[in-house]
Structure formats: structure tokens, C-alpha cells
Amino acid sequence: MNTREKRYVGELSIQDLELLYQLYKYRALSTAQIAVVGNLGKWYVYKKLRYLKNLGYLYSEQITGNYIPNQRRQGSYFRISGKGITLLRKNGYSVDSTADDLKVTRYRIPYLLTANELALSLTNAGWKYKDSREIKKSYDLNKTDILQGSLINSNKDKEYALYILFKKVYRDTLSRIKSEINRNRFENVLLTTRGELSFRSVIKSFMNSDDRVIKGGSVKVLPFGFAKIYLTISSDNKQMHQSFINKQGIKILESYSNKSSSESKVVYDYLVSHNGEEKYFIDLLDNDLMKIHDLKYYRKEDYERDGRKVLVLTSNADFHLNFHKQILDHVHHIDYLSIDPKQVVTYANLISDKSLFE
């Protein structure tokens, strides 16, 4: 966005222009999302949207699909009009796309809104979101690829290809996603799911020994509700993550990136002191399938040589502890530190009691 003179344009304020620009940037936003980006009160946002719509600066349509789980009425979404884009351009905003360029099919709207919701949740924690248009253009990807965009973490050292999955996931869709992941340049992947069934479908497909996805970085599979919270304090935000680990009564001795010895075969997050023992600490709250894959090869002879157990941070949610124990049942030198997932919610201080599978 170019520097522009701060002034009123007709009956529109600078805040109104900025709101229109956010609609341009995100392509489509729900009423609740507009309240967030515009810092508007619950009731005032309706008044503001009605005002801008009556002036012809934006369009609204009903959301169809499964954007809001288990709810028949999905609400409305808004997008900027050609008149709105023209107004932004006249006032110094760098806007190259037309309203038709920004338009998204009704089928894809729930996916876009979900990605925007995740991006808005993570922005204050230092994450940066790039939508699918920008990613496909920058990395010369296929226009038909179904990745929703990318997320650059707070540490600025990982860029995740983002995939959004709803309650019903078809086998063909999973095969297509896996093909994209193997073909594209991203070494890190984040898949968010809605509902327990879709989570288990992704895990089963991605852990299939005949067609396993292997990347040099991370492949994280998380329920959407949990991802919005946990990623703000995960290892992708090192300072917050270390503080969270310390709150669990764990003393960090060394991070893997600064490890003094290359002998260990464990790719751990930290070397820690726990219950009077030195242990390799691995945070599996992120369900990183690459961490799990590597951990499966920390064999008995490696443990006997190193003399260190692995301390795995997990939770008592079904998408954590049971899954981890099932996959790692043959690795006997693991201590599981299971916490209530609401501890993550409390520490992150983002949302209260909600279904983390949503």
C-alpha cells in the first residue's frame, strides 16, 4: 500500500477506506471477521456494512456450505465492489486486481473464510499469511492446486503450505493434496481439519506406509479450533513456546539448533531436565508427522547409548495422546506428559471453552 494523504473522501473516513482495503486484501470476509479487522463493535459493524453497501462500495452474499460447523444458517460474507476498488486507487492504495479478479466461487468461499479466520487469529502473534493467488504467482504453481495459501511463522524461519479440510474428506481429495505436497517446493505443510472424522481420515492417509508423505521440514495435522490457539505459542513462536514449556515445570537446558553434540539420532525440540533426569523433549501438540516418523527410529540401542528418554508433550484430547501412543507403541523409552488442552487455551488467552475439533 502506498503512502497516501489522510483525509475524508465525501462521507467516507480513513477508517472506512482501510476497511475497504482489508476486504480487497482478504477477498472475502464474514461479518465477525470484518469486526476484527475494523476493530468495530458487535452492533456497529452491521451499521457500517449497511452504510458501505448502500453506497455501492461492497457486495454481500449468503455463505453456503460448512463454514460454521453444525449450524444451518451460515451468515453473510462481504467483498469489495469495482466502485470500492476505484475509490481506493484514487486515494493512493496500490490495487491492481478488479472485483471480478477477486471473486471466489460459492463452493470455495467457506475455505477462504476459514483460512482468513486462521490468519486473523495468528497475525497478532507475528505470523504472516499469503493467499493462494500470491503463492501460485510467486512460486509458479498450478492454478488448479487446492492449497489455500501459506503461513510464515513468528520465527520467520518456516513457510507452511496451508490446506483447509472440512468434516467430509474424500479419498480423491486426499490423494490430490498428497500429490501437490510431493510436487511443490514447500518443505513445511499445515493441514487443519473440521471434526474428528476428517482428522482421522487425514492421519490414516498420510501415515499409510505404501503412500507416506515425507518432507524435509514439518507436516502438521491439527483440528482447526486447536490450531488457532496452539500455533500462537508453539515452537513456531520460540519465545512464547519456551515460556509455555517452563510453565509445565520443565527446565530447558539446550535447544536442538544449539546442541553441543551431533551423536543423538533424536531430532528434539529441547534437551530438558524433568523429574531429576535429562531427557529429549519433543512437543507433539503440533501432531508433526515428521517428528513422529523420526521418533519411531529412536531404537533401544540408541537409548542405551544416549541414556536419555524422550519426554513427549501431548494432551488428553483424542487427537493427541491416544493417537501418539498408537503410532509409537513400540518405542518404550518415552515418557508422556499429558496436559488438558484447555491449559493451552488459558495460556494463549485467546478463546474460552469451545470444541477443539471444530
Outline where the language-model segments fall.
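Nuclease-adjacent, charged terminal/linker segments that flank catalytic cores
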Residues: 1-108, 112-115, 121, 125, ...
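Electrostatic, structured charged patches in enzyme active sites and in nucleic-acid/phosphate-binding
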Residues: 110-358
